[in-house]
């Protein structure tokens, strides 16, 4: 596991900026991603029949990704990948649990009594991209995650929030099949454009020690 730390330089006075964010990258094990990619694409039409997600103002939302409403992304509130009856998904769930536990140990964070997950998937076709967005800043925000199922020369960029005006800085995470990324869920992120004829398929999720909505299911 590779741990990435966005951290300020030592402060020289009480008013200089400070930050200390963590994320990590690791490789999943024992998952057939070719089978999983086909399964998710075959399921796409069914997912698109679900209601579109809604924001706090009760308006349709794609999670601020700008992927649009004709997408699985925009149904993120109304299905949970972890409920799919699929062997590769079962193995993926265990990989997520293992990565979560290892990450907490690596950064010295306490383990929660319970862990809940909201999980969806994104399909980007040629010319599409996910715009800059974040998953939340409320007091219960915890960890977000991302698993690359299928990709061809794309990346996800995680921004260092305090430094985005004069000299914007970000961490580029290349989308490699099987890579699992965990990050503090208030870290804003985006992708570059998919220029390939093949779909960029990723599974994304929110983790929480508490059940934030009916769409969250308990995994620990």
PLM feature spans:
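Non-heme Fe(II)/2-oxoglutarate
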Residues: 1-108
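A short, highly charged, low-complexity intrinsically disordered segment
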Residues: 2-8, 211-220
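Flexible domain-boundary/linker segments
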Residues: 53, 195-198, 220
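Short, surface-exposed loop and linker segments with low hydrophobicity and enrichment for Pro/Ser/Thr
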Residues: 88-91, 194-200
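Catalytic core of non-heme Fe(II) oxygenases with the double-stranded beta-helix
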Residues: 108-187, 192, 199-202, 210-217
